[in-house]
Protein backbone atom coordinates (compact mmCIF):
# COMPACT_ATOMS: atom_id res chain seq x y z
CA UNK A 1 0.00 0.00 0.00
CA UNK A 2 1.07 3.57 -0.67
CA UNK A 3 1.77 5.50 2.49
CA UNK A 4 3.65 8.71 2.89
CA UNK A 5 5.99 8.30 5.83
CA UNK A 6 6.15 12.03 6.39
CA UNK A 7 2.42 12.03 7.18
CA UNK A 8 2.90 9.23 9.70
CA UNK A 9 5.71 11.12 11.42
CA UNK A 10 3.55 14.23 11.78
CA UNK A 11 0.31 12.38 12.59
CA UNK A 12 -1.79 14.79 14.65
CA UNK A 13 -2.30 13.04 17.96
CA UNK A 14 1.40 12.85 18.69
CA UNK A 15 2.36 16.28 17.44
CA UNK A 16 -0.40 17.94 19.44
CA UNK A 17 0.74 16.15 22.58
CA UNK A 18 4.33 17.11 21.82
CA UNK A 19 4.98 13.72 23.29
CA UNK A 20 8.37 13.04 21.73
CA UNK A 21 11.85 14.11 22.74
CA UNK A 22 14.12 11.91 20.59
CA UNK A 23 14.33 10.31 17.16
CA UNK A 24 16.82 7.82 15.71
CA UNK A 25 17.04 6.86 12.04
CA UNK A 26 18.90 3.87 10.66
CA UNK A 27 19.49 4.09 6.92
CA UNK A 28 21.81 2.85 4.18
CA UNK A 29 21.72 5.94 1.95
CA UNK A 30 20.38 9.37 2.87
CA UNK A 31 19.63 12.75 1.43
CA UNK A 32 20.38 15.44 4.01
CA UNK A 33 18.71 18.20 1.98
CA UNK A 34 15.48 16.20 1.93
CA UNK A 35 15.89 15.50 5.65
CA UNK A 36 16.51 19.15 6.59
CA UNK A 37 13.74 20.59 4.44
CA UNK A 38 10.99 17.99 4.85
CA UNK A 39 11.59 15.73 7.86
CA UNK A 40 13.47 17.87 10.43
CA UNK A 41 10.70 20.53 10.74
CA UNK A 42 8.15 17.80 11.41
CA UNK A 43 10.34 16.27 14.11
CA UNK A 44 10.79 19.67 15.74
CA UNK A 45 7.05 20.27 15.84
CA UNK A 46 6.63 16.85 17.49
CA UNK A 47 9.08 17.91 20.23
CA UNK A 48 12.14 15.95 19.05
CA UNK A 49 15.23 17.97 19.93
CA UNK A 50 17.49 14.91 20.22
CA UNK A 51 17.84 13.55 16.67
CA UNK A 52 20.41 10.99 15.52
CA UNK A 53 20.93 9.50 12.05
CA UNK A 54 23.06 6.35 11.90
CA UNK A 55 24.07 5.41 8.38
CA UNK A 56 26.42 3.32 6.27
CA UNK A 57 29.88 4.89 5.72
CA UNK A 58 29.37 4.98 1.94
CA UNK A 59 25.91 6.51 2.34
CA UNK A 60 27.38 9.05 4.75
CA UNK A 61 30.20 10.07 2.39
CA UNK A 62 27.82 10.33 -0.55
CA UNK A 63 25.32 12.42 1.44
CA UNK A 64 28.02 14.88 2.50
CA UNK A 65 29.38 15.09 -1.04
CA UNK A 66 26.03 15.71 -2.74
CA UNK A 67 24.64 17.95 -0.01
CA UNK A 68 27.68 19.96 1.02
CA UNK A 69 26.43 23.23 -0.48
CA UNK A 70 22.92 23.11 0.99
CA UNK A 71 23.30 21.23 4.28
CA UNK A 72 22.95 23.79 7.05
CA UNK A 73 22.05 22.13 10.36
CA UNK A 74 24.15 18.95 10.71
CA UNK A 75 25.73 18.91 14.15
CA UNK A 76 23.31 21.55 15.43
CA UNK A 77 19.72 20.37 15.02
CA UNK A 78 20.70 16.74 14.50
CA UNK A 79 23.74 14.45 14.51
CA UNK A 80 24.60 12.21 11.58
CA UNK A 81 27.20 9.47 12.12
CA UNK A 82 28.40 6.48 10.08
CA UNK A 83 28.30 3.03 11.68
CA UNK A 84 31.88 1.73 11.34
CA UNK A 85 32.32 -1.24 9.02
CA UNK A 86 33.22 -4.43 10.86
CA UNK A 87 33.66 -6.46 7.67
CA UNK A 88 32.67 -6.22 4.00
CA UNK A 89 28.93 -5.77 4.64
CA UNK A 90 26.97 -2.53 4.50
CA UNK A 91 24.63 -1.03 7.13
CA UNK A 92 21.37 -1.80 5.32
CA UNK A 93 18.65 -1.67 8.02
CA UNK A 94 16.04 1.10 7.86
CA UNK A 95 14.06 2.44 10.81
CA UNK A 96 12.55 5.55 12.28
CA UNK A 97 12.40 5.31 16.07
CA UNK A 98 10.64 8.23 17.84
CA UNK A 99 10.29 8.15 21.63
CA UNK A 100 9.35 10.32 24.57
CA UNK A 101 8.47 9.88 28.22
CA UNK A 102 5.22 8.08 27.41
CA UNK A 103 5.23 7.93 23.62
CA UNK A 104 6.73 5.73 20.96
CA UNK A 105 6.45 5.50 17.20
CA UNK A 106 8.41 2.96 15.18
CA UNK A 107 8.65 2.42 11.44
CA UNK A 108 10.70 -0.58 10.32
CA UNK A 109 10.99 -1.45 6.67
CA UNK A 110 12.70 -1.17 3.32
CA UNK A 111 12.92 2.57 2.61
CA UNK A 112 16.02 4.72 3.07
CA UNK A 113 16.00 8.26 4.46
CA UNK A 114 15.58 9.85 1.02
CA UNK A 115 12.72 11.34 -0.96
CA UNK A 116 12.49 8.08 -2.90
CA UNK A 117 12.56 5.92 0.22
CA UNK A 118 9.99 7.95 2.15
CA UNK A 119 7.61 9.04 -0.62
CA UNK A 120 8.25 7.86 -4.17
CA UNK A 121 9.34 4.20 -4.24
CA UNK A 122 7.06 1.29 -3.44
CA UNK A 123 8.36 0.32 0.01
CA UNK A 124 7.01 -1.78 2.87
CA UNK A 125 7.08 -0.62 6.49
CA UNK A 126 5.74 -2.09 9.72
CA UNK A 127 4.29 0.66 11.92
CA UNK A 128 4.08 0.47 15.74
CA UNK A 129 2.63 2.98 18.23
CA UNK A 130 3.33 2.70 21.95
CA UNK A 131 0.29 3.44 24.10
CA UNK A 132 1.24 3.55 27.81
CA UNK A 133 -2.34 2.72 28.85
CA UNK A 134 -2.64 -0.40 26.74
CA UNK A 135 0.64 -1.53 25.18
CA UNK A 136 0.30 -4.73 23.13
CA UNK A 137 2.90 -7.46 23.62
CA UNK A 138 3.90 -7.10 19.94
CA UNK A 139 4.49 -3.37 20.32
CA UNK A 140 6.57 -3.78 23.48
CA UNK A 141 8.64 -6.50 21.81
CA UNK A 142 9.17 -4.39 18.67
CA UNK A 143 10.40 -1.36 20.62
CA UNK A 144 12.59 -3.35 23.03
CA UNK A 145 14.16 -5.37 20.17
CA UNK A 146 15.04 -2.25 18.20
CA UNK A 147 16.26 -0.41 21.29
CA UNK A 148 18.54 -3.35 22.19
CA UNK A 149 19.98 -3.30 18.66
CA UNK A 150 20.61 0.46 18.81
CA UNK A 151 22.40 0.05 22.16
CA UNK A 152 24.52 -2.83 20.80
CA UNK A 153 25.55 -0.74 17.80
CA UNK A 154 26.47 2.29 19.90
CA UNK A 155 28.17 0.26 22.67
CA UNK A 156 30.28 -1.92 20.38
CA UNK A 157 31.60 0.82 18.11
CA UNK A 158 33.66 3.96 18.58
CA UNK A 159 31.15 6.79 18.30
CA UNK A 160 31.71 10.42 19.32
CA UNK A 161 30.74 11.35 22.88
CA UNK A 162 27.85 13.39 21.39
CA UNK A 163 26.24 10.18 20.15
CA UNK A 164 26.71 8.43 23.50
CA UNK A 165 25.10 11.43 25.18
CA UNK A 166 22.10 11.18 22.84
CA UNK A 167 21.66 7.49 23.69
CA UNK A 168 21.84 8.27 27.43
CA UNK A 169 19.15 10.94 27.01
CA UNK A 170 16.80 8.38 25.47
CA UNK A 171 17.56 5.94 28.28
CA UNK A 172 16.70 8.63 30.84
CA UNK A 173 13.65 10.07 29.05
CA UNK A 174 11.91 6.91 27.84
CA UNK A 175 12.31 4.52 30.75
CA UNK A 176 9.39 2.42 29.48
CA UNK A 177 11.84 1.06 26.85
CA UNK A 178 13.47 -0.99 29.60
CA UNK A 179 10.27 -2.93 30.43
CA UNK A 180 10.64 -6.67 30.08
CA UNK A 181 9.06 -7.92 26.88
CA UNK A 182 8.13 -11.56 26.43
CA UNK A 183 9.09 -13.65 23.41
CA UNK A 184 6.09 -14.47 21.23
CA UNK A 185 5.39 -17.40 18.90
CA UNK A 186 3.59 -15.33 16.30
CA UNK A 187 5.77 -12.22 16.18
CA UNK A 188 9.45 -11.27 16.27
CA UNK A 189 11.92 -8.60 15.22
CA UNK A 190 15.12 -10.12 13.88
CA UNK A 191 18.44 -8.49 13.10
CA UNK A 192 21.54 -10.34 11.96
CA UNK A 193 23.82 -8.40 14.30
CA UNK A 194 25.12 -11.61 15.89
CA UNK A 195 22.97 -14.39 14.40
CA UNK A 196 21.83 -14.80 10.81
CA UNK A 197 18.18 -14.27 9.89
CA UNK A 198 18.17 -17.70 8.23
CA UNK A 199 19.33 -19.31 11.51
CA UNK A 200 16.60 -17.48 13.42
CA UNK A 201 13.94 -18.51 10.89
CA UNK A 202 14.88 -22.21 10.99
CA UNK A 203 15.08 -22.18 14.81
CA UNK A 204 11.68 -20.45 15.04
CA UNK A 205 10.03 -23.02 12.70
CA UNK A 206 11.54 -25.78 14.83
CA UNK A 207 10.36 -24.18 18.08
CA UNK A 208 6.76 -23.98 16.87
CA UNK A 209 6.78 -27.56 15.55
CA UNK A 210 7.21 -26.92 11.82
CA UNK A 211 10.74 -28.28 11.29
CA UNK A 212 10.74 -30.75 8.41
CA UNK A 213 7.21 -29.83 7.32
CA UNK A 214 7.24 -28.90 3.62
CA UNK A 215 5.92 -25.45 2.78
CA UNK A 216 2.81 -25.30 0.62
CA UNK A 217 4.08 -22.21 -1.10
CA UNK A 218 6.90 -19.67 -0.91
CA UNK A 219 6.30 -16.16 -2.27
CA UNK A 220 9.11 -13.66 -2.64
CA UNK A 221 9.13 -9.97 -3.48
CA UNK A 222 12.72 -8.71 -3.68
CA UNK A 223 14.65 -6.65 -6.22
CA UNK A 224 18.04 -8.27 -5.50
CA UNK A 225 19.28 -11.87 -5.67
CA UNK A 226 22.63 -13.66 -5.58
CA UNK A 227 24.01 -14.13 -9.09
CA UNK A 228 23.64 -17.91 -8.78
CA UNK A 229 20.46 -17.69 -6.67
CA UNK A 230 22.26 -19.20 -3.64
CA UNK A 231 19.85 -17.87 -1.00
CA UNK A 232 16.76 -18.69 -3.02
CA UNK A 233 18.16 -22.21 -3.45
CA UNK A 234 18.71 -22.48 0.32
CA UNK A 235 15.02 -21.75 0.91
CA UNK A 236 14.00 -24.28 -1.76
CA UNK A 237 16.29 -27.08 -0.52
CA UNK A 238 15.46 -26.66 3.17
CA UNK A 239 11.77 -25.72 3.22
CA UNK A 240 10.64 -27.99 0.32
CA UNK A 241 7.90 -25.68 -1.02
CA UNK A 242 5.38 -27.24 -3.43
CA UNK A 243 5.48 -23.99 -5.36
CA UNK A 244 7.72 -20.90 -5.44
CA UNK A 245 6.52 -17.56 -6.77
CA UNK A 246 8.94 -14.68 -7.37
CA UNK A 247 7.55 -11.18 -7.88
CA UNK A 248 9.85 -8.55 -9.34
CA UNK A 249 10.12 -5.49 -11.51
CA UNK A 250 12.20 -6.83 -14.45
CA UNK A 251 13.98 -3.53 -15.17
CA UNK A 252 15.05 -3.13 -11.51
CA UNK A 253 16.10 -6.63 -10.52
CA UNK A 254 19.25 -8.76 -10.44
CA UNK A 255 17.23 -11.99 -10.87
CA UNK A 256 19.09 -13.86 -13.61
CA UNK A 257 16.96 -16.86 -14.60
CA UNK A 258 19.70 -18.52 -16.67
CA UNK A 259 22.43 -18.48 -14.03
CA UNK A 260 19.98 -19.43 -11.25
CA UNK A 261 18.59 -22.31 -13.32
CA UNK A 262 22.11 -23.62 -13.99
CA UNK A 263 22.56 -24.57 -10.33
CA UNK A 264 18.90 -25.23 -9.44
CA UNK A 265 18.39 -28.47 -7.46
CA UNK A 266 16.82 -31.43 -9.23
CA UNK A 267 13.36 -32.45 -8.10
CA UNK A 268 12.28 -28.92 -7.11
CA UNK A 269 10.20 -26.92 -9.56
CA UNK A 270 11.87 -23.73 -10.77
CA UNK A 271 10.13 -20.59 -9.44
CA UNK A 272 7.26 -19.02 -11.35
CA UNK A 273 8.40 -15.46 -12.03
CA UNK A 274 5.88 -12.61 -12.21
CA UNK A 275 6.87 -9.22 -13.57
CA UNK A 276 4.94 -6.58 -11.66
CA UNK A 277 4.44 -2.84 -11.97
CA UNK A 278 2.60 -0.26 -9.92
CA UNK A 279 -0.96 -0.43 -11.19
CA UNK A 280 -1.83 3.19 -10.51
CA UNK A 281 -1.76 5.57 -13.43
CA UNK A 282 0.10 8.26 -11.50
CA UNK A 283 3.03 5.88 -10.77
CA UNK A 284 3.81 4.12 -14.06
CA UNK A 285 7.59 4.05 -13.50
CA UNK A 286 7.70 3.70 -9.75
CA UNK A 287 10.71 1.81 -8.37
CA UNK A 288 9.55 -1.30 -6.51
CA UNK A 289 12.02 -1.47 -3.63
CA UNK A 290 10.06 -3.44 -0.99
CA UNK A 291 11.19 -6.81 0.39
CA UNK A 292 8.85 -9.62 1.47
CA UNK A 293 9.10 -13.37 2.04
CA UNK A 294 5.77 -15.14 2.59
CA UNK A 295 5.60 -18.81 3.58
CA UNK A 296 2.29 -20.68 3.32
CA UNK A 297 2.22 -23.57 5.80
CA UNK A 298 -0.33 -26.38 6.27
CA UNK A 299 -2.18 -24.33 8.86
CA UNK A 300 -1.40 -20.68 8.33
CA UNK A 301 1.15 -18.31 6.87
CA UNK A 302 4.15 -16.24 7.95
CA UNK A 303 5.68 -13.10 6.52
CA UNK A 304 9.19 -11.66 6.84
CA UNK A 305 9.41 -8.01 5.80
CA UNK A 306 11.98 -5.28 6.21
CA UNK A 307 15.35 -4.40 4.72
CA UNK A 308 16.59 -7.86 3.65
CA UNK A 309 16.80 -8.88 0.00
CA UNK A 310 16.90 -12.53 -1.13
CA UNK A 311 20.70 -12.66 -0.89
CA UNK A 312 23.25 -14.44 1.29
CA UNK A 313 24.77 -11.20 2.69
CA UNK A 314 21.26 -10.22 3.85
CA UNK A 315 19.82 -13.50 5.13
CA UNK A 316 22.59 -16.07 5.56
CA UNK A 317 25.46 -14.03 6.95
CA UNK A 318 26.08 -12.29 10.25
CA UNK A 319 26.93 -8.58 10.40
CA UNK A 320 30.08 -9.27 12.40
CA UNK A 321 31.32 -11.70 9.70
CA UNK A 322 30.65 -10.18 6.30
CA UNK A 323 26.88 -9.79 6.16
CA UNK A 324 24.91 -6.61 5.58
CA UNK A 325 23.25 -5.32 8.75
CA UNK A 326 19.53 -6.06 8.29
CA UNK A 327 16.36 -5.74 10.34
CA UNK A 328 13.08 -7.55 9.66
CA UNK A 329 9.67 -8.20 11.18
CA UNK A 330 8.30 -11.75 11.37
CA UNK A 331 4.54 -12.26 11.66
CA UNK A 332 2.62 -15.54 11.84
CA UNK A 333 -1.11 -15.90 11.16
CA UNK A 334 -3.47 -18.89 11.31
CA UNK A 335 -5.03 -17.52 8.11
CA UNK A 336 -3.22 -18.76 4.99
CA UNK A 337 -4.41 -15.68 3.10
CA UNK A 338 -3.36 -13.16 5.76
CA UNK A 339 -0.55 -11.67 3.65
CA UNK A 340 -2.09 -12.01 0.17
CA UNK A 341 -2.92 -8.30 0.11
CA UNK A 342 0.80 -7.43 0.17
CA UNK A 343 1.37 -9.01 -3.24
CA UNK A 344 -1.86 -8.05 -4.98
Stretches found by the model and what they are:
Residues 1-344:
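PLD/PLD-like phosphodiesterase catalytic module centered on the HKD motif
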Amino acid sequence: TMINLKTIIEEDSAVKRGGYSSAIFLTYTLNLNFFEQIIAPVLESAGCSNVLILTDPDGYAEALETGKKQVAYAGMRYVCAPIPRVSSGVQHSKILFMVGKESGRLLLGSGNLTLNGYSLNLENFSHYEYNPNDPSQETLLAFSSVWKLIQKITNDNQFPETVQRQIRKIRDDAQWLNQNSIQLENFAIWSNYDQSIWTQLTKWRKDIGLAGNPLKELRIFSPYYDKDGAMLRRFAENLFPDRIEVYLSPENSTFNANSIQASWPEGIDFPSVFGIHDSREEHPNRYLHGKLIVGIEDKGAWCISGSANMTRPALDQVWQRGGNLELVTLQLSSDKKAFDYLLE
